[in-house]
Swiss-Prot record:
GO terms for biological process: regulation of DNA-templated transcription; regulation of RNA stability; regulation of translation, ncRNA-mediated. GO terms for cellular component: cytosol. CDD domains: Hfq (cd01716). It holds the Pfam family Hfq. InterPro entries: Hfq, LSM_dom_sf, Sm. One of its GO terms (molecular function) is RNA binding. Keywords: RNA-binding, Stress response. Residues 73-92 are annotated as: Disordered. This is RNA-binding protein Hfq.
């Protein structure tokens, strides 16, 4: 698995498992809302009134509606609607 996906997959999986509502901002500025139904290496299946397959390369930001615990010992990802989500425990 690529190093860039070591946080991405657990984050998306936690959102999917807990059915957390998300706002997905695309690189063209469009905002999509729903819950993550499924995902793979290239796409995210976003569910609202319909299911939408969104290519990951088109996604800029994923903002959860509430805090989400990522991974077994991971920190919380906080929701800042309108701002990019932040992870408390990320070390620089």
């Amino acid at each position: 698995m690529a190093k860039g996906q070591s946080l991405q997959d657990p984050f998306l999986n936690a959102l999917r498992r807990e059915r957390v509502p998300v706002s997905v901002y695309l690189v063209n500025g469009i905002k999509l809302q729903g819950t993550i139904e499924s995902f793979d290496q290239f796409v995210v299946l976003l569910r609202n009134t319909v299911s939408q397959m969104v290519y990951k390369h088109a996604i800029s930001t994923v903002v959860p509606a509430r805090n989400v615990r990522v991974g077994p010992g991971g920190g919380y990802v906080q929701s800042n609607e309108g701002n990019q989500a932040e992870d408390d425990d990320v070390e620089q």
